[in-house]
Amino acid sequence: IFGFVMVIGSLLKVPESLTVTNRESSSGLKTMFKNFKILLKTPRFVLPMLIQGMTFVILFTYISASPFIIQKIYGMTAIQFSWMFAGIGITLIISSQLTGYLVDFIDSQKLMRGMTMIQIIGVILVTIVLLNHWNFWILAIGFIILIAPVTGVATLGFTIAMDESSSGRGSSSRLLGLVQFLFGGVASPLV
């Protein structure tokens, strides 16, 4: 009910933020798919979009698999898992805030490259830990290295990709959202 009231309220009270002069002359599915085609031919848009999509694969597979890994393989209770999950969730907030601070001093593409490399290190570490059944604390550190950069990569990927789209910004935003959740949604049941 609350969601329905919010939708109605936003339709009635929130004004359109895009000025009439900046709106596209034609809209609809045909225009959206035409814009998708143009965007998918732009490597400087596609690369951040794919990196962002893979980051959501990491996030969604972590969310799907970690309860089973921690509770079934490592024998922890649901409460212990909840504390670990919350702690790693806090690293997402820290990463988001840190990204907002660092973007003033470091080029966003370099920052995204660095955060992506951190995630790759996390993937390698978590894989090695799980294959060798190493200590839980090493796994937790691996999860932190793997998951903490998600908010930074997602934000930077979106910003970098949107900077490359000169027209059809709505289509750009839709495509970015589609890819990240499509990749994540497809990966979740596979783990």
Language model segments and positions:
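Juxtamembrane intracellular "pre-TM" segments in multi-pass secondary transporters
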Residues: 15-49
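C-terminal membrane-cytosol helix-exit motif in multi-pass small-molecule transporters
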Residues: 2-22
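Short amphipathic helix-loop junctions that connect adjacent transmembrane helices
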Residues: 64-80
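Helix-to-loop junctions at the C-terminal end of transmembrane segments
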Residues: 95-110
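C-terminal transmembrane helical hairpin of 12-TM major facilitator-type secondary transporters
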Residues: 109-157
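Small-residue hotspots at the loop-to-helix junctions and early N-terminal turns
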Residues: 78-86, 173-174
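A late C-terminal transmembrane helix in Major Facilitator Superfamily
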Residues: 148, 158-191
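Pair of pore-lining "gating" transmembrane helices in MFS-fold secondary transporters
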Residues: 41-61, 144-148
